[in-house]
Design a protein with these regions (language model features):
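Conserved N-terminal structural module of periplasmic/extracytoplasmic solute-binding proteins
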Residues: 2-3, 7-10, 22-107, 164, ...
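Extracytoplasmic/periplasmic substrate-recognition and gating elements
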Residues: 61, 66, 71, 228-233, ...
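Short helix-initiation/N-cap motifs at beta->coil->alpha
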Residues: 76-84, 103, 169-175, 237-252
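Hinge/lid segment of periplasmic solute-binding proteins
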Residues: 100-149, 175, 278-280, 346-350
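Periplasmic solute-binding protein
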Residues: 106-112, 128-165, 191-211, 293-300, ...
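Glycine-centered hinge/linker elements that transmit conformational signals in sensory
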Residues: 178-179, 211-240
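Long, aromatic- and glycine/proline-rich binding clefts that accommodate carbohydrate-like moieties
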Residues: 328-362
Length: 362
């Protein structure tokens, strides 16, 4: 028997009457075949530069491939990060996993908003673990540990026949070097009014900025020394002399011989500096060379309904393999000991003395 479904003998109307029911049936059948996404969704919030996010996203993609039952809903918050995290906690919509630093962690931990975490402590620098703990309990697994060093323009030192600084230099050496570097076009050293940048001058002399510390002899000496870099010796720019540029910009413009900053400056210097540069430790005071150590890492919200999956993600992010990936762009000092000693951090790129960052921690 021959089919007459759409034979030339049929009229168009008759043909359509026969085809449409078949098409509708096929649509209903195919619609019922669609697979519902049953994966557990983990919300993960983080700040970060483009280069950081370019490293992070493939890691999250790999995690999903290795854990097909989990889907990551990534929230990149590049600006006003903690303001937005505050609002999410206040509205009971906090992400499962939160990238956090040691400055804000106590606020959330003290409010009982974070889950206590455990980790193999031998894998990480104790300073990073301590920075992300509150009342003796760990609330975030560290990604990085940060500290301040002295960046210096090697070409400028060479032109002025100045010996490169070493980790053994003291405050007198530091001042003399800044004076030698200073001329009508260049200042010897940077000056910033944020406590992060002047606290080392106090701490290295046995002082600090807490009310119980500020009247100490070491605190007063450190503050006076720092202020006199501008006022007395004029080896650091006055506010009016640096109004049109940041300290980082002045260093890149070779208007500063030395620049006190952290590892976060390395990618920018690698890309933009048209001169040779390196790093050394902050100079020694009466109590040695002491700078503040900070850390960032991943925390889990106590309100998370998927703590097991969130823990799996945090452990994955903090693994040796991924810690090495985070180190590749030069932005961070890994909090994992093995990653910090790997070729991915000590990679031979500038600064030549990257190990200085580790010496300060160890």
């Amino acid at each position: 028997m021959k089919s007459e479904l759409c034979s030339p003998k049929n009229q168009l109307g008759n043909c359509l009457k026969k085809i449409i029911p078949i098409l509708l049936l096929l649509v209903l059948i195919c619609g019922g075949c669609a697979q519902k996404d049953t994966r557990t969704v983990i919300e993960f919030a983080s700040w970060g530069s483009k280069s950081e996010i370019d490293i992070l996203k493939p890691i999250l993609s790999d995690f999903e491939k290795e854990n097909p039952e989990i889907k990551i809903d990534f929230m990149h918050i590049p600006q006003n990060y903690f303001q937005k995290i505050h609002l999410l906690f206040a509205s009971n919509t906090a992400p499962d996993v939160i990238f956090i630093n040691n400055l804000y962690l106590p606020i959330y931990a003290n409010a009982n908003l974070l889950e206590e975490l455990t980790v193999n402590q031998n894998d990480f620098y104790p300073q990073a673990l301590e920075a992300l703990s509150w009342n003796g309990k760990l609330y975030a697994i560290p990604r990085d540990v940060s500290n301040l060093v002295v960046f210096y323009n090697k070409d400028l030192f060479d032109r002025k026949n100045i010996t490169y600084p070493t980790s053994e230099w003291n405050f007198d050496d530091f001042l003399k070097t800044a004076q030698k570097l200073t001329d009508k076009n260049t200042f010897g050293v940077s000056f910033e009014e944020d406590p992060l940048f002047y606290l080392p001058y106090l701490m290295s002399n046995g002082g600090g900025i807490l009310p119980s510390e500020i009247e100490k002899k070491g605190s007063q000496y450190g503050l006076n020394f720092y202020a006199n870099l501008r006022k007395k010796y004029h080896v650091a720019p006055l506010k009016s002399e640096s109004a049109s540029a940041t300290m980082a910009q002045m260093f890149l413009q070779q208007k500063l011989g030395m620049y006190i900053s952290g590892r976060w400056m390395v990618p920018k210097l690698r890309e933009e500096a048209n001169f040779d540069w390196d790093v050394t430790q902050f100079p020694k005071g009466t109590n040695g060379s002491i700078v503040q150590l900070d850390a960032s890492g991943w925390a889990i919200a106590k309100s998370s309904k998927h703590k097991e999956e969130a823990q799996k993600l945090v452990n994955y992010l903090a693994s040796s393999k991924n810690s090495e990936k985070f180190a590749t762009n030069g932005l961070i000092v890994p909090a994992r000991k093995d990653a910090s000693r790997s070729k991915y951090f000590l990679d031979g790129q500038k600064p030549v003395h990257s190990k200085i960052f580790l010496d300060i921690i160890e």
